[in-house]
Amino acid sequence: MKLTCMMIVAVLFLTAWTFATADDPRNGLGNLFSNAHHEMKNPEASKLNKRWCKQSGEMCNLLDQNCCDGYCIVLVCT
């Protein structure tokens, strides 16, 4: 039991050490958090608002369900 606990603690420590000392030239976590903060302040900057969707009566994709307001039925947005 003690050995198992020691192994778990060692793995967690090494994982944390790897993430803390990783060389990321793009500042991955810093960019991630600053972009998320920017999107909270400016909802127009969110990538979700820029999705392409089809209006009612246009041809649509059954798999993606890419209609803006309704559903894709028989390849036409309703």
UniProtKB/Swiss-Prot annotation:
GO cellular component, one term: extracellular region
Prodomain positions: 23-49
Methionine sulfoxide PTM sites in chain numbering: M59
Cystine pairs: C53-C68, C60-C72, C67-C77
Domain of life: Eukaryota
Annotated keywords: Cleavage on pair of basic residues, Disulfide bond, Ion channel impairing toxin, Knottin, Neurotoxin, Oxidation, Secreted, Signal, Toxin, Voltage-gated sodium channel impairing toxin
SUPFAM superfamilies: omega toxin-like
Protein function: Delta-conotoxins bind to site 6 of voltage-gated sodium channels (Nav) and inhibit the inactivation process. Binding of this toxin is strongly calcium-dependent but not voltage-dependent. The binding site is most likely on the extracellular side of the sodium channel. Binds receptor sites on both mollusk and rat central nervous system, but despite its high affinity binding to rat sodium channel, it has no functional effect in vivo and in vitro on it. Also has no effect on Gambusia fish. Is important in mollusk for the paralysis of the prey.
Domain notes: The presence of a 'disulfide through disulfide knot' structurally defines this protein as a knottin.
Note: Veratridine increases the rate of dissociation in a dose-dependent manner.
Protein name according to UniProt: Delta-conotoxin TxVIA
Organismal lineage: Eukaryota, Metazoa, Spiralia, Lophotrochozoa, Mollusca
